[in-house]
Regions:
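Hydrophobic faces of well-ordered beta-strands that scaffold small-molecule active sites
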Residues: 51-53, 85-87, 109-111, 152, ...
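Substrate-binding clefts and catalytic carboxylate motifs of secreted carbohydrate-active enzymes
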Residues: 150, 181, 188-191, 197-307
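Secreted/periplasmic carbohydrate-active enzymes, especially glycoside hydrolases
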Residues: 1-85, 104, 216, 230, ...
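Active-site neighborhood of glycoside hydrolase catalytic domains
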Residues: 104, 120-213
């Protein structure tokens, strides 16, 4: 990183600003081949394998977060040999500390705009509000070398194709509103304020306007949730590999030390109201039990279940 110091002096006083920047070349290489179209990160002319995770808010009460909290989590990502984090569109635009640390640690950031898993209006008032927010965030973050890609939303195009939305909502209205927001307003802001960075309309997707084809393993990026949501064996991960797997996973209980912070040991069981209230997945604890039963001997108690 290079440190730049700037000063502006007038008869009324002096303002100083110090910024750090990094110099690098980045592109998303989308080369056509026999499977479809690739989706490869290329840094300084060298294709890389992107290993990483989706980043969600690190605390339910984000104002409690300090720089050292980000430092601990991001250091853990680096120690796990991760080089890429996707700031998920159902969370928040992160603090300056987060991006500063990613710059320092060499972590690439896929930055979603904060739209996820829902329908959004396309009226002028809403679009103007979105444009103001997008302009603020792009202008705030564009000097961070860690950010390599802007993405319009999380799973909204996918939802159209796979969540039954086609049968619930009028296609013409939905399509028009969607395309105005994610194929006109947001890319226009990026092109004006940050033209060197790549813009991708929706994750997962093929980059097309709606209706498009949805996600496919031959092109674009993919989310795969047949393991966990679909109940498939872990081996399904090996059989469902796309060009860029930007989201997949398996739920895990937190460390016992964390559980002890909010639940007395006498109430630590899968049916207790406290444990249930902390389980936010629609499939609940039963799905965790299912996968534990598939791979491990029956746990003796709750604590052995978590461990």
């Amino acid at each position: 990183l290079y440190e730049f110091q700037m000063a502006l002096e007038t008869k009324d006083g002096r303002e100083e600003l110090t910024k750090r920047i990094g110099l690098r070349d980045f592109k998303v290489e989308q080369r056509k081949d026999e499977q479809g179209t690739g989706f490869t990160f290329v840094i300084n002319g060298k294709p890389i394998f992107s290993k990483g995770a989706n980043w969600i808010p690190a605390d339910s009460f984000t104002t409690r977060l300090k720089k050292q909290d980000y430092q601990k989590l991001l250091k853990s990502a680096v120690q796990a040999n991760m080089n890429t984090l996707r700031v998920w569109g159902g969370g928040i635009y992160e603090s300056d500390d987060f991006y500063d640390l990613c710059d320092e640690m060499g972590i690439l950031v896929w930055q979603d705009f904060m739209f996820a898993c829902s329908l959004y209006p396309g009226d002028d008032n809403f679009l103007q509000s979105v444009e103001r927010e997008a302009r603020y965030q792009v202008d705030r973050l564009k000097d961070h070398p860690s950010i390599v890609l802007w993405c319009g939303n999380n799973e909204i195009a996918w939802a159209w194709h796979n969540w039954g939305w086609k049968d619930k909502y009028p296609e013409e209205i939905y399509k028009e509103d969607y395309n105005k927001l994610f194929h006109k307003v947001l890319p226009a802001v990026c092109q004006e304020l940050d033209p060197s960075r790549y813009y991708w309309p929706s994750s997962p997707g093929d980059g097309d306007t709606l209706p498009g084809k949805g996600q496919g393993y031959g092109s674009g990026d993919n989310h795969f949730w047949d393991v966990w949501h679909g109940g498939e064996d872990f081996s399904a991960f090996d059989d469902n590999v796309g060009r860029f797997m930007s989201e997949y996973g398996m739920q895990s209980f937190p460390d016992l030390k964390t559980i002890d912070l909010f639940c007395d040991q006498g109430q630590q069981n899968l049916e207790s109201d406290i444990i249930k209230s902390h389980q936010k997945a629609s499939l609940g604890n039963g799905n965790v039990e299912k996968y534990v039963d598939m791979y491990f001997p029956k746990p003796k108690n709750f604590r052995s279940f978590v461990m």
